[in-house]
Amino acid sequence: MVKTQRVVITPGEPAGIGPDLVVQLAQREWPVELVVCADATLLTNRAAMLGLPLTLRPYSPNSPAQPQTAGTLTLLPVALRAPVTAGQLAVENGHYVVETLARACDGCLNGEFAALITGPVHKGVINDAGIPFTGHTEFFEERSQAKKVVMMLATEELRVALATTHLPLRDIADAITPALLHEVIAILHHDLRTKFGIAEPRILVCGLNPHAGEGGHMGTEEIDTIIPVLNELRAQGMKLNGPLPADTLFQPKYLDNADAVLAMYHDQGLPVLKYQGFGRGVNITLGLPFIRTSVDHGTALELAGRGKADVGSFITALNLAIKMIVNTQ
């Protein structure tokens, strides 16, 4: 790395395991400065519950970034709206969570931070607080005014991007248009090159229907939409294989010759990835003007403050963000 960079972290729902995981992250050295956008008392209380040392250093944006030493975090303070009891949601803190996301996102947009890593949020409590919220991905897309973003989950062995994300099944076929596929594949191809350092990305594309439509006998979306788009993009030099039946695509003879898979919808691709590497996966938002990675699990309220939360996904998300920073320098 040419110089030390700052990475901003949002712990997510304060009553969940996010603060626990951030405290656990702090127990090792990191080659970047970890700036945590959170309430100071929340972090120190959670560290005490876990019996782990934690020193919070004030965030100084005008000073050079320093590698993080074990037992420390750099704090960018955002105040809680209500006291926190581990494992018990407080609707008032839905506003706090969104404030941390907004400040971290704005810091990435203005160049303060080289990447953003997000802990798990509780969408229900944010909406109960009167804030319409469907997820991190959509929030950052709107706030950064990105034209289009793509959700991708990854383990060490597999990357799966989604053409559509949080849609009911009955709406998916209508959502998969030529324009959408052009945009999604272009973003996936671009970010695999620029953020992952893959010179000529090889992308496997799932069909929408069983057996990828079986020549039109089980649906015509492949013939009408997916195949024409893939042919156009192949003519531009992209290495695309598909559409392939999703039930046979996820095997070594295909995956060994691919850098990523494009699934048509959420539950087509993600169950395979999560079965293979649950707790080791990373959620990546492609198409943003900054690097954003996230854990692949939820708030686990029942584990908060008990020292039983697995920090593996957070470590993987941070390590991947650091690699992506290096690739973009």
From Swiss-Prot:
Gene3D superfamilies: Isopropylmalate Dehydrogenase. SUPFAM superfamilies: Isocitrate/Isopropylmalate dehydrogenase-like (SSF53659). InterPro entries: PdxA (IPR037510), PdxA_fam (IPR005255). Binds 1 divalent metal cation per subunit. Can use ions such as Zn(2+), Mg(2+) or Co(2+). Its main location: cytoplasm. One of its GO terms (cellular component) is cytoplasm. HAMAP family: PdxA (MF_00536). The active site is located at the dimer interface. According to PubMed:15026039, PdxA may catalyze both oxidation and decarboxylation reactions that directly lead to AHAP. Catalyzes the NAD(P)-dependent oxidation of 4-(phosphooxy)-L-threonine (HTP) into 2-amino-3-oxo-4-(phosphooxy)butyric acid which spontaneously decarboxylates to form 3-amino-2-oxopropyl phosphate (AHAP). This is 4-hydroxythreonine-4-phosphate dehydrogenase. It comes from Escherichia coli (strain K12). The gene is pdxA.
